[in-house]
């Protein structure tokens, strides 16, 4: 099967320099969602018709399985499909989709393709409570589709029809090529309508059939930021429903954003306002507090992520305790029962089991052993202004508060660093190391007195 995706429109009502089909739904361009659905149908040829912002669209979705056709002037849907004809295989039917209709399911399209077979024209239609603005499906007394009339060209009787054309069609490619060559633009819009192929099919004795989606929202197009927001909420509602049906506890299903793939084990609980980006896996018994952002990460079984944490390309081990207000940056790997507390940042560091950094610390480019206590205000000074260097902290180390470890440096097993230490060379095992200015008390000192203003 050939699949053609129309993605040439300007999107004037978006009031944006970004091509319409690149506006995101769930963090990804609308067109990317349509391409994913198209690929689920295993097409032999996949063609995207570009126009407005063509270079940006090509760059955004370029792939080995995608060919591009260009529509320099946007002269209607029929004209757009004409541009793809040289890239199509006439021995296969062609399915036409739209880059600004991101929620259509593969199951709905498969049903349409099955209904049409290889010899019939198939149209995806839907009954709308208010069909204003949409092309109407006109049927004869026997219920057969005879034509599609656009809103601006419809009579009053035709405007009363509630069954509308979604624009998605499938038909034999040879017939499509013939019918497109006969299209005229003598209509209110002055455009070449793809929908006019229905009348050509009827005239040629080609049966026209229809299929309907499981839900109206599958066919919603986006022409404004308001419609984009509506589609986003529908999509997020669908994601929330999927999670709930899989046994995840969402404290408010209306306040979660999944911008990628979120998979969960058993007895997972997610509080309000959380955002999941990329591929995220939450293992059994995980609890995510309110307003966390988690991207391309795994959270181990029984771990708790307290509110307002940011976790990016990191792995939290089983029974971990993160936050509140903690940040785990790329390359962070935490072992079992590791505690990363409030206002602690960890970057490109491996922290072994049962270690803790509970307050106000930066652990970057470091290897931390087991049962290590990192005191409040501890900083791994990993950057010399040009290069990054690593800090190694072995098992059972105790680091006092307000300590700086100037990398590259190693703290040996069982060592203790006194509060306020600036460590510039290796701290030996099982010993106390500290560097601290001598404390002085100046008996004759007096606090300055504020001078009156003149």
UniProtKB/Swiss-Prot annotation:
Ribonucleoprotein is among the record's keywords: no
One of the GO biological process terms: peptidoglycan biosynthetic process
Signal recorded as keyword: no
EC numbers on record: 2.7.7.23, 2.3.1.157
Region (N-acetyltransferase): 247-454
Cofactor or coenzyme needed: Mg(2+)
Subcellular location as annotated: Cytoplasm
Sequence segments annotated as region (Pyrophosphorylase): 1-225
Pathway assigned in UniProt: Nucleotide-sugar biosynthesis; UDP-N-acetyl-alpha-D-glucosamine biosynthesis; N-acetyl-alpha-D-glucosamine 1-phosphate from alpha-D-glucosamine 6-phosphate (route II): step 2/2; Nucleotide-sugar biosynthesis; UDP-N-acetyl-alpha-D-glucosamine biosynthesis; UDP-N-acetyl-alpha-D-glucosamine from N-acetyl-alpha-D-glucosamine 1-phosphate: step 1/1; Bacterial outer membrane biogenesis; LPS lipid A biosynthesis
Active site (record annotation): 359 (proton acceptor)
Keyword annotations of the record: Acyltransferase, Cell shape, Cell wall biogenesis/degradation, Cytoplasm, Magnesium, Metal-binding, Multifunctional enzyme, Nucleotidyltransferase, Peptidoglycan synthesis, Repeat, Transferase
Entry-linked InterPro entries: Bifunctional_GlmU, GlmU-like, GlmU_C_LbH, Hexapep, MobA-like_NTP_Trfase, Nucleotide-diphossugar_trans, Trimer_LpxA-like_sf
Similarity-based family: In the N-terminal section; belongs to the N-acetylglucosamine-1-phosphate uridyltransferase family.
Purpose: Catalyzes the last two sequential reactions in the de novo biosynthetic pathway for UDP-N-acetylglucosamine (UDP-GlcNAc). The C-terminal domain catalyzes the transfer of acetyl group from acetyl coenzyme A to glucosamine-1-phosphate (GlcN-1-P) to produce N-acetylglucosamine-1-phosphate (GlcNAc-1-P), which is converted into UDP-GlcNAc by the transfer of uridine 5-monophosphate (from uridine 5-triphosphate), a reaction catalyzed by the N-terminal domain.
Protein name as annotated: Bifunctional protein GlmU
Species assigned in the record: Cupriavidus necator (strain ATCC 17699 / DSM 428 / KCTC 22496 / NCIMB 10442 / H16 / Stanier 337) (Ralstonia eutropha)
Lineage, uppermost ranks: Bacteria, Pseudomonadati, Pseudomonadota, Betaproteobacteria, Burkholderiales
């Amino acid at each position: 099967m050939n699949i053609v995706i129309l993605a040439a429109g300007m999107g004037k009502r978006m009031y944006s320099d970004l091509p319409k089909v690149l506006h995101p739904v769930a963090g990804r361009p609308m067109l990317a969602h349509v391409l994913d659905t198209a690929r689920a149908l295993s097409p032999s040829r996949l063609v995207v018709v570009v126009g407005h912002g063509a270079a940006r669209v090509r760059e955004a979705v370029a792939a080995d399985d995608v060919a591009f056709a260009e529509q320099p002037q946007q002269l209607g849907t029929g004209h757009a499909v004409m541009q793809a004809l040289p890239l199509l295989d006439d021995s296969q039917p062609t399915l036409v989709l739209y880059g600004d209709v991101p929620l259509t399911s593969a199951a709905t399209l498969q049903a349409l393709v099955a209904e049409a077979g290889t010899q019939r024209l198939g149209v995806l239609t839907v009954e709308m409570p208010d069909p204003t603005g949409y092309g109407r499906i006109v049927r004869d007394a026997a219920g057969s589709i005879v034509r599609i009339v656009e809103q601006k060209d419809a009579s009053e009787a035709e405007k009363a029809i509630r069954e509308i054309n979604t624009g998605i069609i499938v038909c034999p490619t040879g017939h499509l090529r013939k019918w497109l060559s006969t299209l005229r633009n003598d209509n209110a819009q002055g455009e070449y309508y793809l929908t006019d192929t229905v009348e050509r099919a009827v005239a040629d004795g080609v049966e026209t059939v229809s299929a309907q989606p499981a839900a109206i929202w599958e066919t919603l197009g986006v022409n404004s930021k308001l419609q984009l927001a509506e589609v986003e909420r529908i999509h997020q509602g669908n994601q929330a429903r999927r999670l709930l049906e899989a046994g995840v506890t969402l404290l408010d299903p209306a306040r979660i954003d999944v911008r990628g793939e979120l998979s969960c084990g058993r007895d997972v609980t997610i509080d309000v306002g959380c955002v999941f980006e990329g591929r995220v896996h939450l293992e059994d018994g995980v609890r995510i507090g309110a307003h966390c952002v988690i991207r391309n990460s795994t959270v181990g079984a029984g771990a708790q992520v307290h509110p307002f944490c940011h976790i990016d390309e990191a792995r939290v081990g089983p029974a971990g305790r993160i936050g509140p207000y903690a940040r785990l940056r790329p390359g962070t790997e935490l072992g079992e029962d590791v505690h990363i507390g409030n206002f602690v940042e960890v970057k490109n560091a491996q922290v072994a089991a049962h270690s803790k950094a509970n307050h106000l610390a930066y652990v970057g480019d470091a290897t931390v052993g087991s049962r290590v206590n990192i005191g409040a205000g501890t900083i791994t000074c990993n950057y010399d202004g040009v290069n990054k260097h690593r800090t190694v902290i072995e098992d059972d180390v105790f680091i006092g508060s307000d300590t700086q470890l100037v990398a590259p440096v190693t703290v040996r097993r069982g060592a203790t660093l006194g509060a306020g230490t600036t460590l510039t060379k290796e701290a030996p095992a099982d010993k106390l190391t500290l560097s601290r200015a001598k404390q002085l008390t100046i008996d004759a000192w007096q606090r300055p007195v504020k001078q009156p203003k003149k």
